[in-house]
Amino acid sequence: MTQATPQRIAIAGASGRMGQMLIEAVLDTEGVELAVALDRAGSPSIGQDAGAALGRPCGVTITDQLDALAQADCLIDFTRPEGTLQHLQACLRHDVKMVIGTTGFDSSGRAEIKVAAQKIAIVFAPNMSVGVNATLKLLDMAARILNSGYDVEIFEAHHRNKVDAPSGTALIMGETVASAWDVALPDVATWTRHGDTGVRKPGTIGFSVVRGGDIVGDHTVFFCGTGERIEISHRSSSRATYAQGAVRAARFLARQDNGLYDMQAVLGL
């Protein structure tokens, strides 16, 4: 009996915190192998072994050459929107599938990903955590039940270095509630409050943001009624959960044709 060929994985942002966790997750997962490690041009990590900083040399050298993706089956990318879109074009050139965990895209960037998914298979999700995606299912259920007489507020907290707000996870939570209410999030979202705001408008969804320290990611959705309050929370204590979910998404794509998928599809939820 012949052994199946491992899925060849590429990691973008290989020297960063998330990139290193992704590399470790790939090294720890059966059925996949690290084939390419990408980093930005000028990075001091170029030319180094991708696993050296983990104490696990793996024989894959970090490079800034996007054409190295020709040696991969799937790219996992948790970088910045502008970098991810460059990587997307390289994946299209080399017919490489893609897992995108990057957040902060504008409507144009999201549209570009959607168009690309007509030619390659893509998992695009703001949060790869299994727990977060289970939380989204709970939110959908709660929002369908608590659709009248309850005010919804979404609180999120992240580390001081996160550059986009609200987080992608908070936004998808808001979209989940809005969808259950059969409305569009932009039509009901309240992004900021300051000064004399007047009374709260029924049917709106408020957002609150904290940035500080090394908070990995906290999210709570409040359903506030008269005489009671329901809170649905998820707290991440390690980025490892995102890395493990991303590798799981890559394994899912190995069996998929072209198209745009989310983590709900990956997990069969």
From Swiss-Prot:
GO biological process: diaminopimelate biosynthetic process; lysine biosynthetic process via diaminopimelate
Top EC category: oxidoreductase
Active-site feature positions: 158, 162
Domain of life: Bacteria
Residues that coordinate or bind NADP(+): 40
GO molecular function terms noted in the UniProt entry: 4-hydroxy-tetrahydrodipicolinate reductase; NAD binding; NADP binding; oxidoreductase activity, acting on CH or CH2 groups, NAD or NADP as acceptor
Keywords: Amino-acid biosynthesis, Cytoplasm, Diaminopimelate biosynthesis, Lysine biosynthesis, NAD, NADP, Oxidoreductase
Residues the record lists as binding (S)-2,3,4,5-tetrahydrodipicolinate: 159, 168-169
Coiled coil spans: none
GO cellular component terms, semicolon-separated: cytosol
Gene3D superfamilies: Dihydrodipicolinate Reductase, domain 2, NAD(P)-binding Rossmann-like Domain
Known catalytic reactions: (S)-2,3,4,5-tetrahydrodipicolinate + NAD(+) + H2O = (2S,4S)-4-hydroxy-2,3,4,5-tetrahydrodipicolinate + NADH + H(+); (S)-2,3,4,5-tetrahydrodipicolinate + NADP(+) + H2O = (2S,4S)-4-hydroxy-2,3,4,5-tetrahydrodipicolinate + NADPH + H(+)
EC number assigned by the record: 1.17.1.8
PROSITE patterns assigned to the protein according to its UniProt record, in alphabetical order: DAPB
Pathway in which the depicted protein is active: Amino-acid biosynthesis; L-lysine biosynthesis via DAP pathway; (S)-tetrahydrodipicolinate from L-aspartate: step 4/4
Cellular compartments annotated: Cytoplasm
Binding annotation for NAD(+): 13-18, 39, 101-103, 125-128
Job of this protein: Catalyzes the conversion of 4-hydroxy-tetrahydrodipicolinate (HTPA) to tetrahydrodipicolinate.
Family membership: Belongs to the DapB family.
Protein name per the record: 4-hydroxy-tetrahydrodipicolinate reductase
